Amino acid sequence: MVERLSAEARASALRDLSGWAELDGREAISRTFTFRDFNEAFGFMTRVALIAEKRDHHPEWRNVYRTVEVVLATHDAGGVTMLDIELARAMDAIAAAISG
């Protein structure tokens, strides 16, 4: 089982993740991605889903038109782990590739 990150480790990791923040009232990180249109948003979700399935680590997310709201936490660990940080980095890279 992966270990939950300390508050200091979470803060350090978040400094390198643009747009990500700790979620109020819960040990999780969140970000809202905004794309040009629904097709880009859905394409982002599809690409992330393939990575998430391969890693067996899935986001909580919500899509409305061109936005995708994401929450990451590792339920088995009761908080944020390196699995979440790594998935956040992958999401950032995918979003950057789509937005060009």
From Swiss-Prot:
Any one GO MF annotation of this record: 4-alpha-hydroxytetrahydrobiopterin dehydratase activity
Organism in which the protein naturally occurs: Bradyrhizobium sp. (strain ORS 278)
Protein name as it appears in the record: Putative pterin-4-alpha-carbinolamine dehydratase
Protein family per UniProt: Belongs to the pterin-4-alpha-carbinolamine dehydratase family.
HAMAP family, sorted: Pterin_4_alpha
UniProt KW keywords: Lyase
Record has Iron-sulfur as a keyword: no
Catalytic activity reported: (4aS,6R)-4a-hydroxy-L-erythro-5,6,7,8-tetrahydrobiopterin = (6R)-L-erythro-6,7-dihydrobiopterin + H2O
Keyword presence, Secreted: no
Gene Ontology biological process terms from the UniProt entry: tetrahydrobiopterin biosynthetic process
EC identifiers of the protein: 4.2.1.96
InterPro entries from the UniProt entry: PCD_sf, Pterin_deHydtase
Top-rank EC class of the record's enzyme: lyase
